[in-house]
Amino acid sequence: LEKYGAKLKYILNTHAHFDHVMGEKEAQERTGLPVYVHEDDKILLENLKRQAAFFGIGEAEAPENIKTFDENTVFTLGNQEIKVIHTPGHTPGSVCFLFGDALISGDTLFYGSIGRTDFEGGSFAQISDSIQNKLFKLDENITVYPGHDAQTTIGYEKKYNSPFGKNN
């Protein structure tokens, strides 16, 4: 950010699993910004230390100024709206962020796969519903940027993502 003279406006979370939020306390200290998480995942973020211990990770401190949002929240970045799409299943408060023709999908939708549902609060039925009835209703040309691995498009995933793909 310093290199480009950019200023951070938000610290937004697609969900509150430790592998996505471990550096947020430091980011918050550097920027003074609150951390935003869906209201259904706030407890996960507040209990970051317990999550990290479960996975054998060392010290993990949760951020202090945590703000919640719901599916009706819209963030702005310049003249662009960032829309929240609540996609429970990986966690109860999993969300995707849609802005323009880009979707930040966190751990809900991956290239050829979906997020795990075997952690506490996960639900295969919910993630399936989120993908089929929310994400797959979006324009097929939207580029999906998952929380891990390669980007994809809504159209590609509708066609090929097992068990949802038309070609399976």
Predicted segments with their positions:
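Metallo-beta-lactamase
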Residues: 6, 51-54, 81-168
